[in-house]
Amino acid sequence: MDIIIREIEENDYLDVLSISNNAFGCKHNLEDATIHYERVKNDERYKTFVALFNDDVVGFISSVWSYAIGCEVGFLHIVGLAVELEMQNKGIGTKLIEQIENYAKEKGIRSIILNTGVQRTGAHAFYKSKGYDNHSWCFNKTF
């Protein structure tokens, strides 16, 4: 299976939106997605890559470079990773993780964090298989 990984482009927004809504149960619309990506596309801290199969977007990974006291080079926070359901278990998620890890290494970043839903046990197993440890809790409060 020939998968191409590249940075997101404007014509990918609708596909990424669809994959995100399906994977995470969101109900975002194209206007929301366009506003978001237009806001962050020229900001070095944000990076989104898409996976293409036969020129179709079948997955994506988004991250933000954050800083914290005591973490001089900061860390990369994966804020979204999803692959179309029928394309899962074909190595696409692995290629996306490898791409974001290579990007982090190029920037001198030595730590990547991510959050995943408690119910997403398949995702938990995937991240553990890639060397990620689950040694913290994430709390969320919506206003």
Language-model features: where?
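Active-site rim helix/loop that mediates acceptor-substrate recognition in acyltransferases
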Residues: 28-48
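Conserved active-site alpha-helix within GNAT-family acetyltransferase domains
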Residues: 94, 118-136
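Conserved acetyl-CoA-binding loop-helix of GNAT-fold acetyltransferases
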Residues: 89-102, 129
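Conserved beta-strand in the GNAT
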Residues: 50, 56-65, 82
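Helix-loop element at the rim of GNAT/NAT acetyltransferase active sites that forms part
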Residues: 17-31, 69
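A short, internal acetyl-CoA/4′-phosphopantetheine-binding micro-motif in the GNAT/acyltransferase core
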Residues: 81-88
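Conserved GNAT acetyl-CoA-binding A-motif
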Residues: 97, 104-115
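A short beta-loop-alpha structural element at the N-terminal edge
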Residues: 2-16
